[in-house]
Regions:
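Active-site-adjacent mobile loop/cap segments within catalytic or ligand-binding domains
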Residues: 55, 59-61, 109-177
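Hydrophobic anchor at the start of a short beta-strand
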Residues: 15-16, 103, 141
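Catalytic-core regions of hydrolytic enzymes
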Residues: 1-87
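Acidic, glycine-rich loop-and-strand cores that form catalytic or ligand-binding grooves
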Residues: 79-80, 84-115
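Stable alpha-helical elements in mature extracytoplasmic
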Residues: 4, 34-41, 84-88, 92, ...
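A structural motif corresponding to the C-terminal end of an alpha-helix
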Residues: 4-12, 95, 99-100, 130-139
């Protein structure tokens, strides 16, 4: 994320806000995975009038799982946010795939509510809290799962040095711009 920020800030008029730099919630309340922390990050993006919200992650599963995924908003409720998110997700994944990160059945994805949560118009809501919350605030959000930290090959090829991390960050930035 920090390398992406550095690359984005080379462009005039681009302001990047980082909502965390450690595993603790910068807004209090414990883990960054907590509902409260996610809500506060979404609120922060609204308060700074963000144009986009990008959530950086590494996936984890069994040792054979590989590949890149970028989640974006569904087309329900505020479909323009979904369309903008889809364009952004496709641009980012194109750059990451160009680095050699496989898709292996992943790619650009929508994840809908698994417990029938609905938007105000009655349509099925997005599952991911930062995507759903930012949609309410008219901010396209994507969540990037760069590769699998649980896969030795992914770790060696894409995560094993600062230069490799920088390459990921530059690819993310180029997809965003």
């Amino acid at each position: 994320a920090s390398y992406c920020k550095q690359e984005l800030e080379k462009h005039d008029g681009v302001k990047v806000y980082m909502v965390r730099d450690s595993y603790s919630c910068p807004f209090g309340g414990g883990s960054v995975k907590s509902t409260e922390c996610n809500s506060k990050r979404v609120e922060f993006s609204k308060n700074v009038k963000a144009d986009l919200y990008i959530s950086f992650h590494l996936n984890s599963s069994g040792p054979s799982a590989r590949g890149v995924s970028v989640y974006y908003p569904n087309m329900n409720y505020k479909s323009e946010i979904g369309r903008n998110g889809e364009v952004l997700a496709k641009d980012i994944i194109k750059r990451l795939k160009a680095l050699g990160i496989p898709q292996q059945g992943r790619g650009t994805l929508i994840r809908n509510s698994e417990n029938n949560t609905r938007y105000p118009d009655g349509s099925l809501a997005d599952y991911l809290a930062v995507i759903k919350g930012n949609k309410y605030n008219n901010i396209p959000a994507v969540l990037i799962e760069h590769c699998f930290i649980s896969n030795a090959s992914d770790c060696e090829q894409f995560l094993s040095s600062e230069e490799k991390l920088r390459t990921l960050g530059v690819a993310d930035a180029n997809g965003i711009m």
